[in-house]
Design a protein with these regions (language model features):
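Polar low-complexity intrinsically disordered regions
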Residues: 1, 66-67, 177-180, 197
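Selected alpha-helical membrane-embedding segments in polytopic membrane proteins
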Residues: 2-115
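C-terminal TM-helix exit segments that contain a strictly Trp-centered aromatic cap at the helix terminus
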Residues: 46-55, 143, 184-193
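Short, highly charged low-complexity linear segments
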Residues: 53, 72-79, 163-171, 193-197
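Functional transmembrane-helix hotspots
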Residues: 53-62, 149-152, 191-197
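Hydrophobic alpha-helical transmembrane segments and adjacent short intramembrane/lumenal linkers
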Residues: 104-189
Length: 197
């Protein structure tokens, strides 16, 4: 199953338009959720290992909101429990990836409808999961994490177009707005959540 998921990830990242036009819509809900869980676990295991190796883990070096939250709360959990912040970083990353999934699906479903989209909740699930592939698969890579977050933004455009039928211009404008908010958030909070490796 892991090799199949890695093959899917490669197709999403290398052939995003072809994938979103065809294969993405044909995937069942269980398959999409399993893919998301496997890649989330992959991210949750590798993120703290890279931190232990001495690379920074702060909000600027996070590809996902789950990593940002984990970096913020892991030191606090370490103080409360005595368990290493690196263990907490992994656990919290995975937990927050799972918690955020239905929230992001609901958020993007509502906004897709407001933009004139015609997809159902399954399309919104695929809209969250498949464009998130670069951040989930590669978001642990030192000093390039933010780049993978931007890659996710790039993949949202064809996903909005092909999974919800949203016009290209609206899809680009919406994604640009969301990425602008994310960049502003990073700029405003970037120095405050540093975890020393």
């Amino acid at each position: 199953a892991l090799w199949e998921d890695l093959g899917t990830a490669r197709r999403v990242m290398v052939y995003p338009y072809d994938f979103m036009m065809g294969e993405a819509a044909s995937r069942g809900i269980r398959e999409v959720v399993r893919y998301y869980a496997v890649l989330s676990l992959f991210l949750a295991v590798l993120t703290p290992l890279v931190n232990i190796a001495g690379f920074p883990s702060d909000v600027v070096h996070a590809s996902t909101n789950a990593q940002m939250g984990a970096y913020h709360y892991a030191p606090k959990m370490e103080q409360i429990t005595g368990v290493s912040r690196h263990v907490w970083t992994g656990l919290l990353t995975f937990l927050l990836m799972l918690v955020k999934l239905p929230l992001f699906v609901a958020f993007l479903h509502v906004f897709s409808k407001l933009l004139g989209g015609n997809g159902d909740l399954g399309a919104s699930l695929r809209l969250v999961v498949y464009p998130g592939t670069p951040a989930m698969l590669l978001g642990w890579v030192p000093f390039s994490d933010f780049i993978f977050g931007l890659w996710v933004g790039f993949l949202y455009v064809p996903a909005l177009r092909y999974l919800h039928g949203i016009q290209w211009g609206k899809a680009v404008a919406f994604v640009t707005f969301l990425m602008g908010l994310q960049i502003l958030y990073v700029v405003l909070t970037g120095g405050g959540w540093l975890i020393e490796p």
